[in-house]
Amino acid sequence: IGEPNTAYAKYFTGNSYLASVSREQVNISNVTFEPRCRNNWHIHKATKGGGQMLIGVAGRGWYQEEGKPAVEILPGTVIHIPAGVKHWHGAAADSWFAHLAFEVPGENASNEWLEPVSDEEYDKL
């Protein structure tokens, strides 16, 4: 499941684990979330291209864009996240969850980390 995700722990509620899959051409990481773990709302920014793609590989999780209903992620589910979209993703309350995260190449790409997903918001899932 990778190593404890200490470098990004301040952007997560709960414990997550990170395993690098590739750093050539496209950055790909396997991210594993314990039950109820989720990352903060965030935005992948780029002046051209950019964004992220998630592929569920184990367990059950959630993806949500601001202002839209949450989408369940199961093994094989593919989520395309365009640059500039505020969103979060993480595990279901009753399941460990893992996804592959692909960083879509872009110009001047960066992440803007925002507020945590509150327990009140999360518990509505």
Please state what every model-predicted region is.
Residues 1-29, 40, 110-125:
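A short, N-terminal "cap"/entry segment at the start of jelly-roll beta-barrel domains
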Residues 16, 20, 34-55:
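Catalytic core of non-heme Fe(II) oxygenases with the double-stranded beta-helix
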Residues 24, 34-36, 56, 66, ...:
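A short, compositionally biased micro-patch
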Residues 38, 48-75, 85:
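A short beta-strand-loop-beta hairpin characteristic of the jelly-roll/cupin
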Residues 18-20, 28-32, 53, 70, ...:
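Conserved hydrophobic/aromatic beta-strand scaffold that supports enzyme active sites
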